[in-house]
Amino acid sequence: MAQPQRPLQVPDITKSTHSGGNTVLAYASSAMQGYRSTMEDAHATIENLDALTNTSFFGVYDGHGGSAVARYCANHLHNKVLEQEDFSSNLANALRQSFFRMDEMLRNQAASKELTEYGSGNEYWRTAGRSWLRCAPCVLGPVYCGPLAEGCTACVVLIRNTQIVVGNAGDARCVISRNGQAIALSNDHKPNFPEETQRIVAAGGSVSFSRGSHRVNNGIAVSRAIGDLSYKNNKKLRPEQQLLTCSPEIRADQLTDDTEFLVIACDGVWDVLANQAVVDFVRLHLNNGVELSVICESLLQEAITRDPPSTDNMSVILVRFLHPEGNRGARAATSSTSTGTVPSRHSKSISL
């Protein structure tokens, strides 16, 4: 179990901000370390994941126990979605399978070098992370077992023409604004929620309240996450049945003319700002002509100056739907005249 970070007396409010867009949407992202001693969040914004299907990808990864798994997901998960056989025909299933694929990749020796590079600056990683190579004492020689006590929650959004598909594991959240009404497109996954508790107990675990949160086996305070492989070692259970599962909850929605924007953010934002408060904040600034990047930075500043303030890392992605005239037809024309080039390696921003 990861040791809690010692909070900073003065928060680091330096913000890493990026913006971009295409013919149908504009976006901005911003991240801030805040009161935490290290930055463990990561995110990916890829407005042109696939030209043939007009698919965009946005994801927030909230790390715990270190930043390595969050950064690894930000670097790889969107590519795994693109590689799925169902990518063109069943976006929801492609997204679901990609979450499971991340845990599979983390168990593979090939991931060790990249993960170690990402985690080299984290004190917990340097100390507890050495147990990776000692987790199978019955085997002669070192055995790689993946990140046992480090992981991340993940909230990912895929946008394709008029389709919005959200995959979520953990307590990051996606909220859309429809005519000013905040509508959650994801549910938080906490150990004390009945469906989550049922799975945890069935897997032989327990849920208890300690250190201000409900926890799985007195450890992790979320019930779904990528990584944290020490909770996923029961070989008699399928991945979705483990104490902690990376199985995402999938929600789908239709992009309509009254869908204004969506916000993806980690729990550091939602812990102090309600869904409707965030939508109202964004709408007010949009109506005043404020740039998306400034809105994102202002939202993080709002969260850290609340009473009480957010004491967590904070990351936010804001996607505004442009609804240009002829938008639907323009997308169809782009798809039908495409040369087949898939620009998955550009028009993207990945915050590691």
UniProtKB/Swiss-Prot annotation:
Binds 2 magnesium or manganese ions per subunit. Residues 329-341 have a biased composition (Low complexity). Mn(2+) 1 binds at D62, G63. PROSITE patterns: PPM_1 (PS01032), PPM_2 (PS51746). Keywords: Hydrolase, Magnesium, Manganese, Metal-binding, Protein phosphatase. It comes from the Eukaryota. Mn(2+) 2 binds at D62, D267, D312. Residues 26-321 form the PPM-type phosphatase domain. It is an enzyme of class 3 (hydrolase). One of its GO terms (molecular function) is metal ion binding. Its EC number is 3.1.3.16. This is Probable protein phosphatase 2C 42. One of its GO terms (biological process) is signal transduction. Pfam families: PP2C. Its cofactor is Mg(2+); Mn(2+). Residues 328-352 are annotated as: Disordered. InterPro entries: PP2C, PP2C_BS, PPM-type-like_dom_sf, PPM-type_phosphatase-like_dom.
